[in-house]
Amino acid sequence: MNDCTERCVIVLPSLNPNEKFDRVLDGLLEAGFQHIVIVDDGSDAAHQKHFARARTFPECVVIPHLGNKGKGRALKDGFAAALARFPEAEGVITIDGDGQHLTQDIIACGNRMLEEKTQVVLGCRNFDLPGVPARSVAGNKTTSRMFRLYGIKLSDTQTGLRAIPRQYLQRFCSVAGDRFEYETNMLLKMKQWGIGFSEQPIETVYEDENVGSHYNAVKDSWRITKIMFRALFNRS
């Protein structure tokens, strides 16, 4: 059994999931993950069957939000739950439930984090491969350039697959932002706090135009760019 399946907590935020969510969960369980925190971020009644199914597995804890609070809030609540419920866990692995993150890549990121101990491990896709939607390529290139201005060289600025050592979780719970901007703010705070990161290459998965993902490559990339401009202005 892989180390991270016992020593790490999966944190999975979800809003109105589809069957891809069930397949992701099945993959985690088949791999032997013992601790899975799922945050239902205000999903409607039509999608509750997926969370009801998750609750039947002893490895899963489902935290409901009364109304949509945003991915950032869901992640922070997931971190808090991991700290409180699993005191022996050595870190968390954040993933998305839309099928973009393959089980073997989740394990690779988790195990690398356990080996490196103090580095956040980011699962990074290759946007130069054929078949990647043009808007995703453009959005990532734009935000990558902005991160370089801040002194952060990162090939996949929008990755939701992140393996985080336990010692950083309390601080990450204090990072501003309740929606997609939170993940950008986390990277900026890592730079400010001197927290290092490693990039772990992962499979680049885009199926059915990523139906099930709530990330808008154009709109949310623009939001990230505005955050970066504000950060650069405040730093100067």
Language model regions located:
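Hydrophobic helical membrane-anchoring modules
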Residues: 1-4, 19, 26-27, 149-151, ...
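A conserved hydrophobic helix/loop-capping motif in glycosyltransferases and polysaccharide synthases
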Residues: 8-17, 24, 31
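Conserved short acidic donor-positioning loop in nucleotide-sugar-dependent glycosyltransferases
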Residues: 16, 41-45, 69, 78
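Short, high-confidence coil segments that cap the C-terminus of an alpha-helix
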Residues: 33, 87-89, 117-118, 195
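Short beta-strand/loop segment that forms part of the nucleotide-sugar
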Residues: 33-43, 63-65
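A conserved acidic beta->alpha catalytic loop
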Residues: 40-51, 99
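Acceptor/aglycone-binding surface of glycosyltransferases and processive sugar-polymer synthases
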Residues: 66-69, 73-81, 103-180, 207-215, ...
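Short beta-strand-to-loop acidic/aromatic patch adjacent to the donor-nucleotide binding site
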Residues: 86-100
